């Protein structure tokens, strides 16, 4: 798709199973320490790069196992899924059970108003786990009806944190209202170098109310790779340990002070590793973030 066409050499032949390749492959050189961010409501720290799984499906089973097999060695822990993502929860649960890594992972999933206790039970069963680290109201569908039940599940230790999500600018006003009215540990919102709407209102409010932030669509559904095709990284990208456009886009996102973790989607092991490397090394300061924005905004000049 967008990134597959953009990244050179994507057709390398696999030797052996994807799982064996993932476990045996030489880890990429790490540029500096792992970047972690604090969850304001608890102080627990999370790696700043996780993985989104809305495109996880049966046809990508091998790649999913390979990515989750490598996740621990690369320092990642945050896995975001949803009851609405087809086979995603079941495939994640199967992989983590086989790998024996569930205890080290931070698993987030989502429900909607029509779900409730039965939907939570199904998610727990599919994920093969006794608890969910973060349960979110999917696209704000049922905030007022679900949150009281979620508070009860939190007391019962079926879930650890509560959140709400959106991936649409058109829902930002509704999200802001919920952030002001509801006791939340997390929000999840769309934000990228090309889509900065959340930075004007939602991210400052999250910082003010001490709410952790997961960022979805940091690549704008791969459109950023189309726009970057044929364009070199700026020379100063090396100053923040950036070696690819994916890392450029992700370091921009996670360097915002209010952002806790970005969750880029990936169903190719090479892309997953590239994304995870953005969670190490130096981050841009406010001045360099503005320079990144200017470089991106002037890409057609």
Which residues does each predicted region cover?
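N-terminal secretory signal peptides and thylakoid transit peptides that target proteins
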Residues: 1-14
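Structured C-terminal cap/extension of enzyme domains
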Residues: 13-16, 201-301
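C-terminal segment of N-terminal export signals and the immediately downstream linker at the start
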Residues: 20-53, 57, 74
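Conserved, mostly hydrophobic/aromatic
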Residues: 39, 51, 79, 92, ...
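Active-site mouth loops of central-metabolism enzymes
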Residues: 52-62, 108-115, 239
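Glycine/proline-rich, positively charged
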Residues: 59, 112-197, 201, 207-214, ...
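Glycine-rich, proline-tolerant flexible connector loops at the mouths of alpha/beta enzymes
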Residues: 80-95
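Alpha-helix-loop-beta-strand connector modules within alpha/beta enzyme cores
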Residues: 93-108
């Amino acid at each position: 798709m967008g990134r597959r066409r953009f990244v050179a050499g994507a057709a390398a032949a696999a030797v052996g199973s994807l799982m064996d390749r993932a476990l045996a492959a030489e880890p990429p050189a790490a540029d500096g320490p792992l970047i972690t961010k604090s969850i304001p409501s608890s102080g627990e720290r999370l790696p700043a790069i996780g993985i989104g799984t809305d495109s996880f499906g049966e046809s990508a089973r091998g790649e999913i196992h390979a990515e989750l097999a490598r996740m621990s060695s690369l320092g990642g822990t945050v896995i975001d899924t949803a009851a609405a993502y087809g086979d995603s929860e079941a495939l994640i649960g199967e992989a983590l059970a086989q790998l024996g890594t569930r205890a080290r992972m931070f698993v987030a999933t989502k429900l909607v108003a029509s779900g409730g206790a039965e939907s939570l039970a199904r998610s727990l069963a599919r994920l093969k786990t006794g608890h969910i680290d973060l349960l979110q109201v999917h696209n704000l569908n049922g905030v007022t009806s679900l949150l009281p039940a979620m508070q009860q599940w939190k007391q019962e230790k079926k879930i650890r944190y509560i959140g709400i999500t959106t991936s649409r600018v058109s829902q930002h006003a509704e999200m802001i209202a919920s952030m002001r009215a509801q006791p939340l540990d997390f929000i999840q919102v769309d934000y990228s170098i090309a889509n900065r709407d959340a930075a004007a209102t939602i991210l400052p409010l999250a910082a003010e109310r001490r709410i952790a932030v997961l960022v979805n669509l940091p690549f704008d559904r791969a459109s950023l790779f189309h726009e970057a095709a044929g364009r070199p990284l700026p020379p100063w990208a090396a100053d923040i340990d950036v070696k690819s456009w994916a890392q450029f886009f992700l370091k921009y996102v996670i360097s915002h002070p209010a952002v806790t973790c970005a969750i880029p989607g990936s169903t190719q092991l090479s892309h997953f590793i590239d994304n995870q490397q953005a969670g190490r090394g130096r981050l841009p300061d406010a001045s360099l973030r503005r320079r990144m924005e200017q470089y991106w905004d002037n890409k057609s000049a």
